[in-house]
Regions:
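Hydrophobic residues on short alpha-helical segments
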Residues: 160-164
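ATP/adenylate-binding site constellation spanning eukaryotic-like Ser/Thr protein kinases
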Residues: 22, 58, 83, 107, ...
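Short aromatic/basic micro-patch
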Residues: 53, 80, 112, 184, ...
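A generic structural signal for short hydrophobic patches within well-formed alpha-helices
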Residues: 25, 118-119, 229
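Phosphate-/nucleic-acid-contacting segments
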Residues: 155, 166-234
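Cyclic nucleotide-binding regulatory domains
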Residues: 16, 41-106
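Cyclic-nucleotide recognition modules
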Residues: 77-137, 141
Length: 234
């Protein structure tokens, strides 16, 4: 079995890990192990005990939540995490239960630092709590932006904005101006992510397609004109 260190080139493409000092980054990898998930396999559910810190190095993980009784539960897809995203830091900080569900959307490989290991190491090296806090505060900023958009922007702008964010890796990549052309996401997933109906999602995507900004295919959205898509967000 390959050691976690083989995925260092992937992790180094992420802004947070790339800017960690060596005396934090190297012990993290030394404490890590690889975790492989099949499509649809659940990593953890809301209410589960903390299990550590994770980084996606292959595949993708959806972070979601549900409300209501089982027979009428409503689901919300918060985000789809792809390489080189890290997650799980909240429970490292407060030692409390998981706040949402995490599930692989395709065959996935994770770098996993078990909870007890990272807790003990940070207690012995408290100066590095600040580095981990930067991972959490960056996500908090993004969450505030998403809340503002949900309250103020109409659905077409919200959808375009989310596509731009996904194309740019939610700002997590190290390379300035880096983006990707194809976003692997279904219309159903996109509608759950934005809390709009599947029909509305389809109508907005068709409009963007007619303006030659995107091309919609089964399970993916191809960005044809990123600058034009940014213009829709304004």
């Amino acid at each position: 079995m390959s050691p976690p260190s083989v995925y260092l080139p992937v992790l180094q493409t992420g802004r947070w890990f790339a800017h960690l000092p060596p005396d934090f980054a190297q012990p993290l990898i030394a404490m890590a192990q690889l975790r492989h998930l099949a499509t649809g396999e659940v990593l953890f559910r809301r209410g589960d005990a903390p299990c550590g810190l994770y980084a996606v190095v292959r595949g993708a993980v959806s972070i979601s939540g549900t409300r209501g009784r089982a027979d009428e539960a409503r689901a919300a897809l918060l985000i789809r995490l792809e390489p080189p995203h890290w997650f799980g830091e909240i429970s490292v900080f407060d030692n409390s239960a998981r706040t949402h569900d995490a599930q692989a959307t395709e065959p996935t490989t994770l770098v996993h630092i078990p909870h007890e290991r990272v807790q003990h190491w940070l207690q012995a090296h408290p100066q590095h709590w600040h580095g981990l806090a930067l991972l959490m505060t960056d996500k908090l900023r993004s969450a505030f932006v998403a809340m503002e958009e949900l309250a103020l922007l109409p659905a077409p702008q919200r959808l375009a904005r989310r596509l731009v964010m996904m194309a740019e890796g939610y700002g997590q990549w190290t390379a300035e101006g880096q983006s990707r052309r194809v976003i692997e996401i279904s219309q159903e997933q996109l509608s759950l992510m934005l809390a709009i109906s599947r029909q509305t999602t389809n109508q907005i995507l068709k409009d963007l397609e007619s303006r030659q900004l995107v091309r919609v295919q089964r399970g993916e959205v191809e960005i044809l004109d990123l600058a034009g898509l940014r213009g829709v967000c304004a």
